[in-house]
């Protein structure tokens, strides 16, 4: 699973997801891609599940690029803990995804295989996505 090798600060504020993605919203390496339609946190486990689904369906053919990286730590407190005594410890990593963000890219496979692979990966995501094609 993806996670940063080292970070400057162990804990972060949760923040909020306003607006649409202005960066990472164009296909740059592959030919087909799923594009986010809603804002959400996507965990490193979900990213890995989607990557596995695409690579299994596409078999040996083609190449996959993961365009999002989980760089935000999410903290959780232990169950049945009293209030106070500081912020909880980091439990998992998420990627903050806004609408229009490209999640993965696929190249080197026919359109029908890419579309089916992306649909399987989209089921593993907590958001709605759309299938887009690079038109030159």
UniProtKB/Swiss-Prot annotation:
GO terms for molecular function: rRNA binding; structural constituent of ribosome. InterPro entries: Ribosomal_uL16, Ribosomal_uL16_bact-type, Ribosomal_uL16_CS, Ribosomal_uL16_dom, Ribosomal_uL16_sf. Residues 1-17 have a biased composition (Basic residues). The keyword Cell inner membrane does not apply. Transmembrane segments: none annotated. It is found in: Plastid, Chloroplast. It comes from the Eukaryota. CDD domains: Ribosomal_L16_L10e. Residues 1-25 are annotated as: Disordered. GO terms for cellular component: chloroplast; mitochondrial large ribosomal subunit. Pfam families: Ribosomal_L16. GO terms for biological process: mitochondrial translation. The keyword Ribonucleoprotein applies. Keywords: Chloroplast, Plastid, Ribonucleoprotein, Ribosomal protein. Part of the 50S ribosomal subunit. PANTHER family: 50S/60S RIBOSOMAL PROTEIN L16, LARGE RIBOSOMAL SUBUNIT PROTEIN UL16M. Belongs to the universal ribosomal protein uL16 family. This is Large ribosomal subunit protein uL16c. It comes from Anthoceros angustus (Hornwort).
